[in-house]
A protein has these predicted regions:
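Periodic aromatic/glycine/histidine/acidic cluster detector
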Residues: 19-107, 111-120, 125-130, 137-144, ...
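Bacterial Sec-dependent N-terminal signal peptides
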Residues: 1-29
């Protein structure tokens, strides 16, 4: 379902997760501090269990490289993806039927390094925060800021008007800022009636439809 992504988010987005993180955020000397931590022992245990299960199903699968990631459903019904590399742990989680997921990246000691939210099919959204190893906030980015002129709520109304099935796996929504610093929304979906894809590009400054066409793929 997810082109995972993203993103989606970083080259490291072959990631991992355990249970929902426990966190506390305080402000100290005008600096935000986050004490969210990942239980690294539990994360390592999860990855090992997944590795052992895969080895039973596919003997020799990890002879060349050991398992570094794991996917499971937690007690709250979230699908969790957990991954470890030389610099830290990546954890994402999302729930069936939801359009958005949570992103966390942790230092090797378990302290949180980056937090954010993402749309399951293509883009990061909301407030993303980066912390140093002591939990001090060093960067905060509003991913939605360039698209305030034509927001997600406007996109939802547009999709409803066009009768686009947002939950169809062939439907994708992306957004980007071009080299001229102009923000755009990009929507594509499959019309089963005519067996073709529709592509729409919308200027996020004013909602003007720049492109509305059919592409045969």
């Amino acid at each position: 379902m997810v082109k995972l992504f993203l993103i989606i988010a970083s080259a490291f987005f072959t990631a991992c997760v355990s249970r929902a993180p426990q966190k506390a955020i305080t402000k100290k000397k005008n600096r935000m501090t986050c004490f969210e931590r990942l239980d690294t022992a539990e994360a390592n245990k999860r990855i090992l269990e997944c590795s052992e299960k895969e080895e039973m199903e596919f003997p020799g699968i990890h002879l060349i490289e050991p398992a570094t990631d794991c996917e499971f459903v937690d007690s709250m019904g979230y699908t969790v993806y957990l991954c470890k590399n030389d610099s830290g742990y990546l954890k994402t989680r999302w729930k069936a039927g939801n359009l958005f997921g949570e992103y966390r990246y942790y230092f090797l000691n378990g302290n949180v390094q980056e937090t954010g939210e993402y749309f399951l099919r293509e883009f990061n959204c909301g407030i993303w925060r980066e912390y140093d190893i002591d939990g001090n906030l060093i960067k905060e980015t509003d991913m939605d800021k360039p698209y305030k002129g034509y927001s997600w709520q406007n996109i939802m109304l547009f999709i409803k008007k066009r009768n686009i099935d947002l939950y169809d796996e062939e439907t994708n929504i992306d957004r980007y800022v071009d080299e001229s610093n102009v923000p755009y929304w990009y929507i594509t979906w499959f019309d089963r009636g005519i067996k073709a894809f529709h592509d729409i590009i919308i200027d996020a400054r004013n909602g003007y439809v720049v492109k509305d066409g059919i592409s045969h793929r």
